C-alpha cells in the first residue's frame, strides 16, 4: 500500500498493512501490525516492524500532513537537544502528495502513567500509591520546564514508564519559550493548570502538597496558589465543555450519526456491542425484566451475550404529547449528556453506552438510552435495617456525605432524589434516572434546586426516625 492510500482507509483499516517507505538508507517496507490511535484521513499511530526491528510508527496523511510532520519532528528534536528522555527516532520522511512518517524505537513492557493512575484513581485521596504516580509526573514536568519546554497537550498518557525510566512522548505537543532557560512563571502556571485540571476534584485540597514534587525539581519561581487555582478552574471548565461537545459528534471517543431519520450516538469502544442492541431495543425490552412500562417511559433490564444492560425507551403517548416533544432535544439526549457529565466530573452513575432518537423528516419521535446495569441495592433497601437505630455503616455515611459534597462543588441538582434513584455500587453511591438533572451556572438557582433535592431525599424516611435525624444533622446544606 502507498502511504497516501491511508487517507481513505477510514477508522479501522484491515491489518496488517505493508507500506513502502524510504529513508537515507534506501527503500524498505514497514509492516503495521496494530493501531493504537487513529484520526481518520489524517493520523495513524501503531506498532509495526521496520528493517526487522519493532517500531512505533506515526503516519501522517492528507492536506495537513506536512504541517503535522514538521511539528512532530521539531518537538522530538527539541526533547533530544535538551537531554530529555524520549524514544529514539529511527527514521523519518516526508514525501509530496504521499504524507509523512516517523518511526520510533518501540518501548517493550511499557506502561503509561495514565494506565498507572487508572489502577489507583478510586483509592483514598492522595494515598501513597496515588502520590507516587502524580509525584513522578510532576517531577518530569518540572524537568521539562527547566529546559524552557512545555507539553501543550499535557496528560498522563504522554509519560511512559519502561525499564525503570520515564519517557516523554508525543513531540507534536512540545512547545518552546527559550530553549535551555527555565520557563517563565506565567507559562508554568498555565501548564500546571492543564495538569491539575485533569485530576479529580477530591484531590483539590492536596494541590499544594503535590506541588512539592514539582518544586523539588524546578524551584525557579514562587507559584501563588490563588493564581494556579484560577488556571485550574479555567482549564477544567473548558475541558468539560469540550467533552460534552464530543458526546454529540463523531470522534475518537464517540460514534455519532445524525440525519433526518434519526440520531445515533455510541461510545466508540462499545460500537460493535451496541449496534445490535439498538436495532432490537423494543424486542429486548419485551423480553427483559421491566421496572416501568407504559406512559412516558418504559425501563427494563435486558441480557445481551451474558451482559446485563438497562434500556430506557422514551415513549410518545399521543399526538398532543408528540407536539410537546418533537421540536426540542429528547429526554434520552438529556440523560445521555448528563450521564457523561457526571462520569467526567467523577460522580458515580451507570455509564451511558448508546443513544437512539427516531426522527421523521427531522422531527423527533421515540428515543432510547442504553446504560450499564447496576445491581444495587438502592439506598432504601440498603438502609432499611438502620431506620430505627440510625446505626448505618460509617463508610456508607461518609460516601453519602461525599456524594452531596460533589453535587455542591459542581452545582449539580438531580431533580428527583428519591431513594430508588440512589444506588450502592463499588463502595460509592451512584445516581440514576437523570432526566431532570441540571448543572447550574448560578449559585442562587443551584441553592434553590439543591434544597428541593435534599428535602426530597430526606422524605425517604419518617421524620421521627433515628436515621432521618442522623442524616438531617450530617448531610451538607447550601
Feature map (PLM): residue ranges:
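Juxta-kinase regulatory segment immediately upstream of eukaryotic protein kinase catalytic domains
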Residues: 1-33, 228-288
Amino acid at each position: 500500500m502507498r502511504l497516501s492510500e491511508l487517507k481513505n482507509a477510514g477508522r479501522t483499516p484491515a491489518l496488517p498493512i505493508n507500506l513502502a517507505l524510504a529513508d537515507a538508507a534506501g527503500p524498505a517496507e514497514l509492516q503495521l501490525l496494530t493501531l493504537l490511535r487513529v484520526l481518520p484521513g489524517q493520523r495513524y499511530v501503531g506498532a509495526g516492524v521496520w528493517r526487522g526491528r519493532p517500531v512505533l510508527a506515526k503516519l501522517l496523511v492528507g492536506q495537513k500532513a506536512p504541517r503535522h510532520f514538521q511539528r512532530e519532528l521539531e518537538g522530538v528534536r527539541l526533547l533530544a537537544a535538551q537531554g530529555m528522555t524520549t524514544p529514539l527516532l529511527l527514521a523519518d520522511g516526508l514525501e509530496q502528495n504521499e504524507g509523512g512518517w516517523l518511526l520510533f524505537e518501540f518501548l517493550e513492557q511499557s506502561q503509561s502513567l495514565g494506565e498507572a493512575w487508572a489502577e489507583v484513581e478510586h483509592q483514598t485521596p492522595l494515598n501513597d500509591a496515588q502520590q507516587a504516580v502524580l509525584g513522578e509526573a510532576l517531577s518530569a514536568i518540572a524537568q521539562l520546564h527547566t529546559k524552557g519546554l512545555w507539553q501543550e497537550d499535557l496528560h498522563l498518557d504522554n509519560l511512559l514508564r519502561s525499564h525503570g525510566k520515564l519517557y516523554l512522548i508525543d513531540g507534536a505537543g512540545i512547545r518552546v519559550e527559550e530553549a535551555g532557560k527555565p520557563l517563565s512563571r506565567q507559562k508554568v502556571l498555565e501548564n500546571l493548570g492543564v495538569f491539575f485540571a485533569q485530576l479529580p476534584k477530591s484531590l483539590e485540597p492536596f494541590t499544594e502538597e503535590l506541588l512539592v514534587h514539582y518544586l523539588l525539581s524546578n524551584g525557579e519561581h514562587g507559584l501563588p496558589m490563588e493564581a494556579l487555582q484560577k488556571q485550574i478552574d479555567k482549564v477544567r471548565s473548558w475541558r468539560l465543555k469540550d467533552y460534552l461537545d464530543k458526546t454529540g459528534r463523531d470522534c475518537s471517543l464517540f460514534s455519532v450519526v445524525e440525519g433526518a431519520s434519526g440520531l445515533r450516538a455510541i461510545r466508540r469502544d462499545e460500537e460493535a456491542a451496541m449496534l445490535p442492541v439498538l436495532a432490537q431495543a423494543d424486542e429486548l425490552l419485551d423480553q427483559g425484566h421491566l421496572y416501568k412500562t407504559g406512559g412516558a417511559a418504559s425501563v427494563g433490564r435486558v441480557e445481551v451475550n451474558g451482559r446485563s444492560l438497562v434500556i430506557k425507551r422514551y415513549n410518545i403517548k399521543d399526538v398532543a404529547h408528540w407536539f410537546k416533544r418533537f421540536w426540542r432535544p429528547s429526554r434520552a439526549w438529556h440523560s445521555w449528556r448528563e450521564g457523561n457529565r457526571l462520569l467526567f466530573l467523577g460522580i458515580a452513575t451507570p455509564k451511558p453506552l448508546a443513544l437512539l432518537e427516531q426522527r421523521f423528516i427531522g422531527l423527533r419521535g421515540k428515543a432510547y438510552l442504553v446504560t450499564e446495569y447496576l445491581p444495587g441495592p438502592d439506598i432504601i433497601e440498603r438502609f432499611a435495617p438502620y431506620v430505627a437505630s440510625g446505626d448505618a455503616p460509617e463508610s456508607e455515611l461518609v460516601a453519602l456525605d461525599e456524594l452531596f459534597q460533589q453535587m455542591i462543588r459542581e452545582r449539580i441538582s438531580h431533580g428527583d432524589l428519591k431513594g430508588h434513584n440512589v444506588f450502592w455500587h463499588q463502595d460509592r453511591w451512584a445516581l440514576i434516572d437523570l432526566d431532570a438533572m441540571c448543572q447550574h451556572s448560578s449559585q442562587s438557582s443551584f441553592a434553590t434546586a439543591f434544597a428541593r433535592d435534599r428535602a426530597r431525599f430526606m422524605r425517604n424516611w419518617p421524620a421521627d426516625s433515628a436515621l432521618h435525624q442522623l442524616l438531617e444533622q450530617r448531610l451538607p446544606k447550601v
